[in-house]
A protein has these predicted regions:
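N-terminal basic/disordered segments at the start of proteins
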Residues: 1-27
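Conserved ATP-binding subdomain of kinase catalytic cores across diverse folds
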Residues: 24-39, 56-59, 66
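Short glycine-aspartate micro-motif
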Residues: 3-7, 127-131, 192
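Helical "lid/coupling" subdomains associated with nucleotide-phosphate turnover
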Residues: 17, 40-63, 80-91, 95-119, ...
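Ser/Thr-glycine-rich phosphate-binding loops at phosphate-binding pockets of nucleotides
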Residues: 10-12, 133-139, 197
Length: 288
């Protein structure tokens, strides 16, 4: 049976059509639109322009679902709905476009992130995972494949792109998070799991630079890439443009900056990248 999942995030709006084969999700169709929804929030209000832009994408996605004759589909929204005063109006506008949207809390997003990552990182039974999104970053600590702590902070690559790229800023975000949620450090290991778009984009760039097909990254080698991008090294910028889709390039370095602060805070020397994320976790949870 085939299922459709629409993910309305801070940076992109994604549609994936899955087919479950022996409980494993196989992607039949995938498309994404770089709406940068979080950038339309001003004074805790989502601008009409952002809502309208998202509605137009949802209408297109509904047509695709109809073309594929998908009867079972659901949509969810992550960080963009959490700190706005016109949340109800925005969700109603999406409903008026023909798509009912489930609003996930930060904790729910983090938990579904971890569940989705289990499709290919279950061999790491104890440790920490993170997902740097457009408007938020999720942290999950787990022991024996069970969640100990799952939290979300309203800091992501789109929001960071509005500031100077500075490790001092992101180091402080991570330090404050670990002070507030000390359980995140109770399952610390040398290898940390990277989930979501920033982590996957980093792996693509890493693979391009180092000519590897591995699904993990050595932190010291990734740091070299980061430093070259900060220096505006033309060769490294060319590697980035070859590896990372155009819609993400503008917010990539701010996201990588956050990533480097995370591995520093957790004293990790290796990052295992998962192909699964909140979407697969949502699929497993909301489609029985």
């Amino acid at each position: 049976m085939q299922f459709g999942v629409i993910d309305i995030g801070s940076n992109t709006v994604v549609l994936i059509i899955y087919e479950l084969e022996n409980g494993f999700p196989k992607v039949i169709f995938h498309t994404s639109s770089h709406v940068h929804l979080v950038s339309y929030i001003e004074n805790h209000v989502m601008k009409e322009e952002g809502i309208e832009k998202t509605c137009n994408v949802l209408k297109e996605y509904k047509k695709i679902l109809e073309e594929y004759q998908i009867k079972e589909y659901k949509a969810f929204i992550t960080e963009p709905h959490r700190n706005i005063d016109n949340r109800k109006e925005m969700l109603q506008a999406f409903s008026n476009c023909g798509i009912e949207v489930i609003a996930l809390s930060g904790k729910e997003e983090a938990e579904l992130d971890y569940l989705g990552s289990q499709i290919d990182t279950k061999f790491i039974s104890t440790g920490t995972a993170f997902d740097i999104g457009g408007g938020s970053t999720e942290f999950i600590s787990f022991e024996n494949n069970k969640i100990i702590e799952a939290i979300s902070i309203p800091v992501g690559c789109v929001r960071l792109s509005k500031q100077e790229v500075s490790p001092l800023i992101t180091d402080q975000y991570v330090e404050d998070t670990l002070d507030t949620y000390p359980k995140l450090l109770e399952t610390k290991t040398n290898t940390i799991i990277g989930i979501g778009g920033t982590a996957r984009a980093s792996l693509k760039l890493y693979q391009n630079v180092y000519h590897t097909h591995e699904s993990y990254m050595d932190v010291s080698k990734l740091e070299y890439i980061y430093n070259k991008l900060v220096e505006k090294d033309t060769d490294m910028i060319s590697h980035m443009k070859e590896s990372i889709e155009a819609g993400r390039q503008e917010v990539y370095l701010p996201g990588l900056n956050m990533l480097m602060s995370i591995v520093k805070g957790f004293k990790a020397n290796k990052i295992q990248i998962s192909t699964g994320c909140v979407r697969e976790g949502f699929l497993f949870t909301y489609f029985n």
